[in-house]
Amino acid sequence: MSRRGPEEEACGVWLDAAALKRQKMQTHLLKLGTKMLTLLPGERKPSIPFTQRRATRQTSITSFVTSQPGMANGGNQKNASSLKENQINRECKSRSQLDCLDQGLEDDCLVSPLATSTPADIREAGHSPQSSQISGCQSLETTSLTMMSFPQPVVLMGTGESKAPLASSFTQFLERSCLLDQREAKRKREGLCGSKTDCPGMGSHIRPPGGKCHQPLDKAKVEKRATAKENRQAPVHLQTYRFGSHSGKKTLLVTKSPCPLSVFSWDIDRKDRDSWSQLFTEDSQGHQVIAHSTKMPFQDVTNARNQGSGQFPDSPQAQGQDGPTLLHLQPHLLFTQDSEGNRVIRH
């Protein structure tokens, strides 16, 4: 047999039984009655002991992590409630620190005192009685809003304590936000008023409470503005009818505007229909055609002239002199006959 080269020997996997026997092996458990994570040789113990009793049933991950040997189910519940309380306290502390930072940054913001604060605390904080009254009113308003909009504090399971510090910090935050909104609205109003008073083109300005108005009024500008307002605000002319009953009698109360609108009447519609029927008629075949009056006899006036003026009837001079009376008195000037004897409009 040919001997394998060193390259082929390096590719194989060789197990040394003596080396395997020399490895350390875990022969016994660290604590009786517990199930620990198996540790490799040379590894440290875990910081959190993942233990579980024999007689207890695992219902949540918190009981598995925090339970220790010697505690029952009641102890697990107490540990869970204590963890929740600690978490709530940490959140309250962090929020109070943020509130302190907000107070340091925003010196102009008025902070309302709490309901538990005493007058001595208010004086030490530097609040005057008037400011404390104002802030107290504002705090009452905001707290009433928060009480109406939010439910009662939730009671923790297994304990009789409530989330009172969390609710109080939340109400404080709402109060500060409301006060900031009020101050921003006041600043905007003051800015608008200042822009109105500083405008040079304004004819009239707001008079100060303790001084006189020294800016002259431009009458022409005031009149122009008044006329523009009148033009923009077009009056609505309406007629209102009210029926009132007094002592058993019905009375009609009519209020009219100075320029009443034209009231629609059915007579106008009837007149239009009559005129429409006079203009059009039906022929022998049932088609709608223009109606021609047959009062005047048919005359051929193609080459006829106006006897009084000696002009053609179609000339603008004749029409301007006589006007519509010429057309009404002489209808034969409007109509003529064609080659078949039918009456047609004169062209």
From Swiss-Prot:
Renumbered residue ranges of the record's region Disordered: 301-325
One Pfam entry name: AIB
GO molecular function terms noted in the UniProt entry: damaged DNA binding
Region (Interaction with RBBP8/CtIP): 273-347
UniProt keyword annotation of Phosphoprotein present: yes
Keyword Nucleus among record annotations: yes
GO cellular component: centrosome; cytoplasm; nucleus; site of DNA damage; spindle pole
Phosphoserine: residues bearing it: S284
Biased composition (Polar residues): 301-322
InterPro entries to which the protein is assigned, alphabetical: AUNIP
Keywords tagged on the record: Chromosome, Cytoplasm, Cytoskeleton, DNA damage, DNA repair, DNA-binding, Nucleus, Phosphoprotein
GO biological process assignments: double-strand break repair via homologous recombination; negative regulation of double-strand break repair via nonhomologous end joining; spindle organization
Location of the protein in the cell: Nucleus; Chromosome; Cytoplasm, Cytoskeleton, Microtubule organizing center, Centrosome; Cytoplasm, Cytoskeleton, Spindle pole
UniProt-annotated stretches for the region Interaction with AURKA: 182-347
The protein's role, per its UniProt record: DNA-binding protein that accumulates at DNA double-strand breaks (DSBs) following DNA damage and promotes DNA resection and homologous recombination. Serves as a sensor of DNA damage: binds DNA with a strong preference for DNA substrates that mimic structures generated at stalled replication forks, and anchors RBBP8/CtIP to DSB sites to promote DNA end resection and ensuing homologous recombination repair. Inhibits non-homologous end joining (NHEJ). Required for the dynamic movement of AURKA at the centrosomes and spindle apparatus during the cell cycle.
Subunit structure: Interacts (via C-terminus) with AURKA (via C-terminus). Interacts (via N-terminus) with NIN; this interaction blocks NIN phosphorylation by both AURKA and GSK3B. Identified in a complex with NIN and AURKA. Interacts with RBBP8/CtIP.
Family affiliation: Belongs to the AUNIP family.
The protein's name in its UniProt record: Aurora kinase A- and ninein-interacting protein
